[in-house]
């Protein structure tokens, strides 16, 4: 059970996980923007897979912090 309430916008109800997804997407873009110039992507074998795993980790952290 989440602490966040149901989010209603223009008559549409969104579950609390929607807010967590948006927050984690913004944090993911921030982390990716920091990691790109650092050269970490030169060491990564599959950048798309790395980005997916990074987003999953960020989403997990956000969802654990908001529960």
Swiss-Prot record:
Source species of the chain: Pantoea vagans (strain C9-1) (Pantoea agglomerans (strain C9-1))
This protein's UniProt keywords: Cell membrane, Membrane, Transmembrane, Transmembrane helix
GO cellular component: plasma membrane
Mode of membrane association: Multi-pass membrane protein
Coiled-coil boundaries: none
Alphabetized Pfam families for the sequence: DUF1656
InterPro entries given in the database record: DUF1656
Full protein name: Protein AaeX
């Amino acid at each position: 059970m989440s602490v966040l309430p149901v989010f209603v916008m223009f008559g549409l109800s969104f579950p609390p996980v929607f807010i967590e997804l948006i927050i984690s997407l913004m944090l993911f873009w921030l982390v990716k923007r920091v990691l790109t110039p650092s050269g970490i992507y030169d060491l990564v074998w599959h950048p798309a897979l790395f980005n997916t795993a990074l987003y999953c980790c960020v989403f997990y952290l956000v969802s654990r912090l908001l529960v």
